[in-house]
Amino acid sequence: MMVSRRELFGLAAGAALQAPRLAGQEGQRPVFRVKVDMVVLAFTVTDSKNHYINGLKPPDFRIYEDGILQKLNTFAEGTKPPLLIADDGTARPLVDAQGSGTAPEGGPVGLDRPDAFIGTNVFVLFDTSNFMYRGFVYAEDAIADFVRGLDRADSVAVYTFSRNLSRAAVLTRDHNDAINGLRRSVAGDDTALYNALLLTLRDAAKVPGRKVVIVFSNGPDNASMVAPDDVRAVAEDEGITIYTISTNEVTKDTISNSALRRIAQRTGGKAYSARTWQKQVEAFESIREDLGNSYTITYYPAANPNEGFRKIAVEIVSDPGKKFRVHTRPGYRPSRSL
């Protein structure tokens, strides 16, 4: 059964959340497949001292999939306006000074909303379960400070979850509106972290441009019907970077913290352990720095017979000594089952 990527998330999320009803139907798990069109690749570049390398241009990069050189489609650094890369390698603004798109009418899918490629679409997923009860108010303050500090080009959504997901504030460039939604959140009971994360990824997948999900949680999950690695694979294939902030002690719940760390690393994000308000603020500051010092490249994959996992490699042509380090996802599956 072939379905679109958007249809997959609706079906997959529905199937995941209704799993208990299907307990007696062994061997009847539906399989849905998705196909990747335009690839959005976000990454940071650092030196040996972990300092960000800024100012690199499109000719400085070569992107490979399974060793096959890819043609760049668009290029952006931080919150600067994205550039459209022509066949001859020249670049021009994707969006003009008035905010109008310069992509040709009838052009490639994904460029029909050029303004969506300005800034980052940030989804904050906030754990409001009983595991977070003691630090609830402090966590709210740390998230609110983070949202206030985002670049005005960034869009932000605030989702909360315990057993169920609540869209406290849908994606908006009005950061005050997002904070107001956050302040209306209430504490819940059990924790279905991976159910909530899958639903958040479904929403993020509908939005063009660069997407980031920040998971703020105590870590344990006692109510989800989907596995962490399944959710991680969806984010990896969609090109959605995930950052995780755990308020739990690493040594107290090694399984949960290990799962969160793996999700972050495999999607090009970072994992933080932050029990105190100060550590939480520092984690958010680190994430904000990552967003402001990142590069985002899009491309349409060249012909490749590999329908399994495709390895992505980013080469910096202007760094022949290989002194720089690229932080990004290791690859994706152009067509996968869930």
Could you say what each language-model-derived stretch is?
Residues M1-G14:
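N-terminal secretory signal peptides and thylakoid transit peptides that target proteins
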Residues A23-L338:
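Scaffold/interface architecture of coatomer-like assemblies
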